[in-house]
Amino acid sequence: MAKLGIKHYRFSMAWSRIIPDGRGKVNEEGVDFYKRLVDCLRDHGITPHATLFHWDSPQALEDLYGSWRSREMASDFADYATAVVSRLGDRITHWMTINEIPSFTHMAYAVDKQPPKAPSTRVSSLKEVWQTCHNALLAHGLGCQAIRAASPSSCSVAMVADIGVTVPLTESAVDVAAAQQAFHTSWFNGGIIFPVLTGAYSPVMLEKLGADAPAIQSGDLKTIHQPLDSLGINNYTGNYIRAADNKQGFEFLDLPKAYPRMYIPWIHILPESMYWGIRHVSETLGRKDLPIFITENGCAAQDEVNDKGEVIDTDRIMYLRQYLKAAHRAISEGYPLKGYFLWSFMDNFEWESGYSRRFGITYVDYKTQRRIPKASFKWYAECIQQNRVV
């Protein structure tokens, strides 16, 4: 990391490493692991940004009450946040509560994808799926309160969202307006970032859900709508939208079969999604005051070590260069983008793909654990050194 030249590093903590039973006794050895990690980062001039939950629910709470199916999960998450921040708040001042709520609610309880084919995960109705999502939003809100209460000094609190980015097919006034309207109707947005940033679910989305909308108790929305110091956005791709002569006034466009994708089916290359995601949050939601960080952006590539011991991932460089240029456009137009985290520093375990897809700019030989900086590593280091897209 020091060789790469980064000054900020985002990582996630494992709830069950800190509190093995999900609630109750804290494992101080687990805390010590993160103390060593953070101390090493700081010794190298790297500021840590910690995400408290990145999908690894404690099995004990799954067995006890079904984890996110229960509102109890929210209060247990707050207790976990208190345990972490009270022990590490002297080292970490940048906190993120939860990463990508749809990924462990809708993608797990509705379609059995994350984690893949987890036993007894799928629930019987859409309403139950939305209830898991609502419970996670409550956890975010209670987690924000817990972080601020436990931190020994002033700190920054954020949430990380994988928003549904609606990209206008053209930048004509009618297509831009259509994309803005479509942004409201996406459940990624209307059901997640709307309550977090505005204190209410999108009326359009609630009308669409009808009886499948989650049960909302008195005070829930106030709890969810906590003051944030920034919003993290994970951006990989998006959807094209154009104006249409229908009830909605817009339509989502299917991509051609030959549309370029990276080495994973769901990442079709759409760099404009970077710009429009930032713009929609700032403009469409009326939150021009809220700093935005890109907390994930990157892609899988078919990385192979050549006979010179190198990994020449020029396709990843192409992808990153286009997305960073779109981010620069957002900054140049005055939108409050304040930082960028590349996904990822090194090859990792992907929830759907396991070790079969590589997202890192550092190649990991999983048998020997040897690390090989890829061509994209050297390119990104040059971007950092020159403080521009090269």
Walk through the language-model features, giving the residues of each.
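Catalytic domains of carbohydrate-active enzymes, especially glycoside hydrolases
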Residues: 1-14, 226-231, 284
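N-terminal substrate-binding region of glycoside hydrolase catalytic domains
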Residues: 3-31, 62-68
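Active-site region of glycoside hydrolase catalytic domains
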Residues: 22, 31, 35-390
